[in-house]
Every structure is written in structure tokens, then in C-alpha cells.
Regions:
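Glycine-rich FAD pyrophosphate-binding loop
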Residues: 21-49
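A conserved short coil-to-beta-strand element within the FAD-binding core of flavoproteins
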Residues: 130-143
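Short hydrophobic core segments
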Residues: 5-7, 34, 134, 157-173, ...
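A glycine-rich dinucleotide-binding beta-alpha-beta segment and adjacent secondary-structure elements
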Residues: 130, 310-389
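Glycine-rich active-site loop/strand segments that organize a redox cofactor
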Residues: 49-97
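Beta1/beta-strand and adjacent pyrophosphate-binding region of the FAD-binding site
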Residues: 1-12, 32
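An anion/pyrophosphate-binding glycine-rich loop and adjacent beta-alpha core
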Residues: 38-40, 45-46, 54, 58-61, ...
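Glycine-rich loop(s) and the adjacent beta-strand/alpha-helix scaffold that form part
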Residues: 162-208
Length: 427
């Protein structure tokens, strides 16, 4: 019997295993999943704060971070053709879509998605080996040989006709990822884009720890101070932390900080009043002054901003701590400018533990549209092992599930069919 082995039991790996089992002729192919964790899907259970934001209705190449957008297009088309949402519907998963296009299981439970996958894998006879750590993977004339250590610490050797590498990247080591997939891709001669934490918070050079825990609606702009240009703009809720900035819009900006191609001297500029231009905001501030006779700057922000945030902004504008009605009219233009151009420099992405996904990876031109590695027939790389990281909102799970489905189906197609036995004619 021919065998397909999937290395990694995360979203991409489970989808690959199930798609392969669904596509294989009955009794012709054994499908095996190896995962180092005590249970598969550990990271999947944590996605979407446990609700599993598994897809998005706005899938487009522009929603992904990669060094080669042109190479991404045919790959993303193949992933879209795998139709993850329709595939899940056929498995019995009912979903809902919110106003931002984010797709969730109707139950809002990531555990239900995992249980559904596990149930179908068991029904189709897929062997799942947990607590199994892959040590080496080698290619030979008959296919591939995998050396791994099982949960009891015993060495095990498996033979495979096709291997799907779904071991994730470096993001979220607490979920069992260790970057083996990308390291193995390099060992096979594959070229890698440098790895970096993607969709993560940002440390700033001078964090204001008094603001830790405060949230504010803002337009966040990533600047390249060396090139004097805007890299990207995101709107949403910013969370101030004791180390810098967080929140979905900040995490989105972190995706642009790829080593070698991102801004050399990045900075984030916050606009705390994006609905008003600077002239209108100046007028708004000036109109408040007659309402606050003899009042201190701390009173100025009542009804506008969190008082701690207002005090920090006042300090950033370098205005004196005097009654607001004693300040010159020009002060309100200065304050409006500070509120719309609050600069945070010295950016450093937080580490792998906080990152939601991995930027960089095996370059996309190294694989076919069905994510088969061009240098090794029967070897596939899916999900985070590839240089494709999605934005927040279900784009990464779309890529994980879709690339896994595409790989699983193609792996079955790639297997050499045994020659049919000749019919013996009766004499």
C-alpha cells in the first residue's frame, strides 16, 4: 500500500490529511499524520480568541505579505480553487460571516472545527500519531524515509511515497512550532526569504508606561523616516502597552517590517482624530477654551480622550501646564498637529511568542501552483512554511486550509499507480 505522510497536525496538516484521504481510492493509500504535541490542532484552538476565524470573504493578493506578489497570484488562485469554505460545508460545518467579512463557525467554537476534522479523519482511517517528533527526512529512490521519536522516546522509521510538510513556521513556539519545516526546505536546496515575526505588537524606543492598558481609535501610519515616505496605513483600535504599541492595526503594520525589504528606520505615526482634518481639529480645540475658564490642562480632555492619554499628548505637544484660557490661540494648532502626528520611533517587532504568524519562508517560485516542491517530486510545503503571511481576519487560515487541501489532493494524484494485473484467460 502506498503511503502519504503529513508532518504536522495543525490547520494545514489536518486539511491535507483529510483531503488526501478523501481523494485516495479505497484501500490504496495509507495517510498518516505526525505531530509533536499531545493533541493535534493546538494552535488552531487558540485562533480568533478561541472562536476560530477560519476564512474571509475578501481574499485578495493584497491581503498577504510576501517578497514575490507576482508568484503569489497563481498559488492563491489554486488555494481559492480548493474552496476551503465549501469543503468545510460539505463536512457539516455551518458558518457565519460578520460585517468585516470574517468567517467563523456558527458555534463560535474553535474546538468544534477541530472535532469535526478529527471525526472525519478517524472515519476515513487516517492514522494520527501524536507526541511524535520528526528528527530527519531523507529522499531515496523509492520515496522518502522519515526518522522520528515517538511519545515513549523510541525511534521510529516510516517510509512515504509523498510527504506534506505542514510543520508551521517559528511563530507561537508555545504551540509546538520550531521552524523544522523551513529548515528542511533549506536542506533540500530551497531558497528562503528571511523569517520574521509577523502580526505582532511593536516595541518603541521610549514607551510611556503610564499609558499601559489604554485603548484608542486611531489611524496608524507606518513611516520610513530615511526615505521620507509612507509605507502603510491602518485604521482601528490601538492599545498602549508598557513596551510600546499593540492592537490589530499595529499588528497589521508589523507585516511590513520584513528584513531587507522593509523600512530601515521605521516609525509609527498616530492620528487620534482621523475623522477631522487639522484645521477642523484646531477649531474644535479652540472652541473648548471658553467652556473651561481657569481650568488645568487635565480638564481639557474631559469628553474627548482618556485623561492619561490626554496628558501624554499635551506633553508631546510641549505645551505649558497653565490654565487653558491663558494659552495663546496658536497653542491649539500645535496641539492639533500633535494629535494627528504623534510619532513613535525606534520600532522593534515583539518576538515569536507574540507573533500570530511567520513572515518569510520558502520562496514561492520554488513550488508549483499545487505547492509541490520543484526540486523533489512528491514533497509539498504548505501554510507557514511558505513565504506568504496573511493579514488579520481569517486570511492565514484560508491559506493554511486551502494550501493543505490542494497539497493533499495533488499528493494522491502524484502517486504512481500500480500496473493492473493481466486477466488470465480460462482455457
Amino acid at each position: 500500500m502506498q503511503q502519504i505522510v503529513i508532518l504536522g497536525g495543525g490547520a494545514a496538516g489536518l486539511a491535507a490529511a483529510l483531503a488526501a484521504a478523501q481523494s485516495a481510492p479505497a484501500g490504496a493509500v495509507r495517510v498518516t499524520v505526525l505531530d509533536r504535541n499531545p493533541r493535534c490542532g493546538k494552535k488552531l484552538l487558540a485562533t480568533g480568541n478561541g472562536r476560530c476565524n477560519l476564512d474571509n470573504t475578501g481574499i485578495a493578493p493584497e491581503q498577504y505579505f510576501t517578497a514575490d506578489p507576482a508568484a503569489l497570484r497563481p498559488l492563491l488562485a489554486a488555494v481559492d480553487a480548493a474552496a476551503p469554505l465549501e469543503w468545510f460545508a460539505a463536512l457539516g460545518l455551518y458558518t457565519r460571516t460578520d460585517e468585516a467579512g470574517r468567517v467563523y463557525p456558527y458555534s463560535n467554537q474553535a474546538a468544534d472545527v477541530l472535532a469535526l476534522l478529527e471525526g472525519h479523519l478517524a472515519r476515513l482511517g487516517v492514522e494520527v500519531r501524536t507526541g511524535c517528533t520528526v528528527q530527519t527526512l531523507s529522499q531515496n529512490r523509492s520515496g522518502y524515509t522519515i526518522l522520528c521519536e515517538d511519545a515513549e522516546g523510541q525511534d521510529q522509521t516510516l517510509r512515504a511515497d509523498a510527504v506534506i510538510c505542514a510543520m508551521g513556521g517559528n511563530a507561537g513556539p508555545q504551540f509546538g512550532t520550531d521552524g523544522f519545516g523551513t529548515r528542511f526546505a533549506a536542506q533540500c536546496g530551497g531558497k528562503l526569504e528571511p523569517l520574521y515575526p509577523c502580526l505582532t505588537a511593536l516595541q518603541t524606543a521610549k514607551p510611556n508606561r503610564s499609558l499601559a492598558g489604554i485603548r484608542a481609535k486611531a489611524a496608524a501610519t507606518l513611516l520610513d523616516l530615511d526615505r521620507h515616505c509612507t509605507v502603510a496605513v491602518e485604521n482601528g483600535e490601538v492599545q498602549f502597552t508598557d513596551y510600546g504599541l499593540s492592537g490589530i492595526c499595529i499588528m497589521q503594520l508589523s507585516g511590513h517590517l520584513a528584513p531587507g525589504r522593509g523600512p530601515k528606520r521605521p516609525a509609527v505615526e498616530l492620528d487620534l482624530f482621523p475623522m477631522l482634518d487639522e484645521t477642523a481639529l484646531t477649531a474644535l480645540f479652540a472652541a473648548r477654551v471658553p467652556l473651561l475658564p481657569g481650568k488645568a490642562p487635565a480638564d481639557f480632555w474631559t469628553g474627548l480622550l482618556n485623561p492619561k492619554l490626554g496628558r501624554a499628548l499635551w506633553a508631546a505637544a510641549k505645551l505649558p501646564e497653565k490654565p487653558v484660557d491663558t494659552l495663546p490661540d496658536a497653542a491649539w494648532q500645535v496641539l492639533a498637529n500633535a494629535a494627528k502626528h504623534w510619532l513613535f520611533e525606534g520600532l522593534t517587532p515583539c518576538g515569536w511568542k507574540q507573533a500570530q504568524t511567520t513572515g518569510g519562508g520558502l520562496i514561492l517560485t520554488e513550488v508549483t501552483p499545487s505547492v509541490q516542491f520543484k526540486g523533489c517530486p512528491g514533497l509539498y510545503f504548505v501554510g507557514e512554511t511558505l513565504d506568504c503571511a496573511g493579514s488579520c481576519g481569517g486570511f492565514n487560515l484560508h491559506w493554511a486550509f486551502g494550501s493543505g487541501i490542494a497539497a493533499g489532493r495533488d499528493a494522491v494524484r502524484s502517486l504512481k499507480r500500480p500496473a493492473p494485473k493481466p486477466n488470465k484467460k480460462k482455457r
